[in-house]
Amino acid sequence: MRKNFRIGLFAGAFVLALMPALRLSAGPGPAKHDDNNRQEIRHVLLISIDGMHAVDYENCVASNTCPTLAGLGHTGLTYTRTTTSRPSDSFPGLMALVTGGSPRTVGAFYDVAYDRVLAPPAADTGNGLVHGNCIVGVINGTQTEYEEGVEIDQSKVNGGGPYSPFDGGVLSIDPKKLERDPFNGCNPVYPWNFVRTNTIYGVIHAAGRFTAWSDKHPVYAVVSGPTGTTSPSNVDDYYAPEVNSNVVNIPGFKTANGKDCSNISANTNGDWTTDFDSIKCYDQLKVNAVVNWIKGKNHLGTANAPVPAIFGMNFQAVSVGQKLIENGVKGGYTDAAGDPTPSMAGEIAFVDASIGQMVTALKHQQLLDSTAIIITAKHGQSPIDTHRFFPIPGHSGTNGMPPSAVLAALLPASATSGLGLAEDDISQLWLTNSNDTATAVSMLEDNGTAVGLGQILYGASLTTIFNPPGVPNVPGPCCWLREGGEPRTPDIIVLPNVGVVYTGSTKKQSEHGGFAWDDTNVMLLVSNPDIRPRTIHSFVETAQVAPTILEFLGLDPDALDAVREEGTPVLPGLFESDHE
């Protein structure tokens, strides 16, 4: 049984002498006052700075370029060896933070993946997943897409939903573009029902507390966890301006560090991720939503609402700053030590100023003492050393070929045309027939140089991490894990050499999704005025954030399905054991 935890920071040698068996912890525990009259933790602000490595945080603090983050570190625990989910894609990365689980339990491998049971959508998606038939009561098999392509109009900030121009949410999702469940009347599978486990949002909402989140796509209302309905009802206020929509001017709007967004569309003809400044304007929309929540408003600031018990957002600016090459100007890093280029440093400075706006709002509302701030990242980015970047096939098309090209004859049609596989610095391969796995592995070995092969996971090397690939013995309604094969586990995972990215683009120099250290070692900072600053060097995982949040709020971490299944502990150093 999980031990209880409590506030454990004691002042004075006298108390320590009287209680020698108690370990000195770094800060506040569950939501109750201790003898030192500390504020109870009533709110948790969770921030994912997508792409933010542990070394990025260390470097910006050392160079005095992120004063807000440095200040939070003065009242916080810093974890230097934090690893994300594997794969390190945004979808499983976010799920780790809110479920406490890995793809093995949660069932989320990538935003574009495959399910051997589900059926294709009723309409083509905006990114090219072709519609198909759904045969009731029969195993079908389809790629799964939970990104911008399932929106009504992904070119618009509001996703084409019934919102004002700069609003956005789940009503932008077109159910005709969602995969369907042949064992549930061929009904669409909404993203929050696609995942198999509950989330902190479900637990906190069930406890009668207000919840909110903001992210880059409407489908990331998946943080709700399963509801069995067409609504992610565990999230009381969800805000998702579409990051891959076309850049438009935002009149009278400025970022935290003063960038005017009134004429931002002059910078690019692309989406918000194609320009170093545009992405700041995009992220600022979400920053303003967080500030509105702190002020007791809804995300637009147009109505009163409770201050959420759990709330937060993801930043895209650092991730874009790491990858982007714009008109010959490179983001990323100047060396293998992670020293940022000026463009990359500007993205970190913007994020720092934005978090500063949140901290200022918490102070103004007298909420800082009662709020735990957790700052981490869904994923990192690889390679940090851009000299190691090697695109396959590259812009010329002559640098080699991705694994999907080598195995094209063994893959479902949807993987080689239309939407295609999501091959970044990883390749996950679902074969048409799993019995061809040995043949496929031999083909990859024979073409190892062409694919930049580092490691192949299949068979036992795969099933030590994930459930065995296959189909259930007795299939049933989505999305429970059933006896037999796992319909979502790839047959093969290719981990390329460090620096290899499967792309032909000339506008990127890194990616994420893989298992490399640069992909997975992200910053993790837990801050509150009552926490004594400390750096923890033991290995931890971002999945430990989920049970830690519940512990902060005085709720049972074992209420999370994935925590019970995987034994995910709370983060070390924060809570004091009762030593019963």
What name fits each language-model region?
Residues 99-112, 212, 228-293, 335-352, ...:
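Acidic, His- and aromatic-enriched active-site or binding-groove loops in soluble protein domains
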Residues 64, 80, 87-89, 111-168, ...:
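Secreted, luminal/periplasmic, and some membrane-associated catalytic domains
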Residues 41-54, 71-73, 97, 204, ...:
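Beta-strand elements within well-structured catalytic alpha/beta cores of enzymes
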Residues 70, 425-467, 528-530, 538-565, ...:
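Non-catalytic, well-ordered alpha-helical segments in soluble enzyme domains
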Residues 218, 222-234, 297-350, 387-389:
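Active-site His/acidic residue clusters
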Residues 27-77:
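Active-site-proximal N-terminal segment of extracellular/periplasmic enzymes that hydrolyze or transfer
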Residues 57-110, 210-212:
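Short, structured active-site-proximal loop/turn typified by the sulfatase FGly-forming signature C/S-X-P-X-R
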Residues 79-98, 214-224, 314-316, 563-570:
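Short, solvent-exposed turn/loop segments enriched in Gly/Ser/Thr/Pro and often Arg
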